[in-house]
């Protein structure tokens, strides 16, 4: 039996998520397969502005809108490493194609392009990522830790971070206040 891939899906933390790192988190899943899963938390700013990040990596950044943009806390794994989620996908040295139009890039060339004003149309930069070993995410979903729904790029790239969690919840089509964090069997 072939397992269902949740790549290009949102993971929505259930109300009552016990882990404070993931409480009220919205994760964009970039990869999901038999070896595990990885994604980026897309609604938690890291407290670092793009200008600070680019200063740290010695790249100029003159575009004021980009300078004031937020860098996100992508998750607890490799928190000192940058991950750039963007569309269109483009042609970068180290990219994971999530969809035909969305990629996750970890190579510095995409940051150099941002510095030079040649950035992808839409991007989200995070430090760190969220990762799950084989079967771990499936268990967390079965234990009512996460809700899943196909991702909408407009939520990732167009909405303010404060609105992303509720917008993803709205994709489910029901009132999240009706959810219980209690696990049980009917």
UniProtKB/Swiss-Prot annotation:
InterPro entries: AlgH-like. GO terms for cellular component: cytosol. Disulfide bonds: none annotated. Belongs to the UPF0301 (AlgH) family. This is UPF0301 protein CV_3909. It comes from Chromobacterium violaceum (strain ATCC 12472 / DSM 30191 / JCM 1249 / CCUG 213 / NBRC 12614 / NCIMB 9131 / NCTC 9757 / MK).
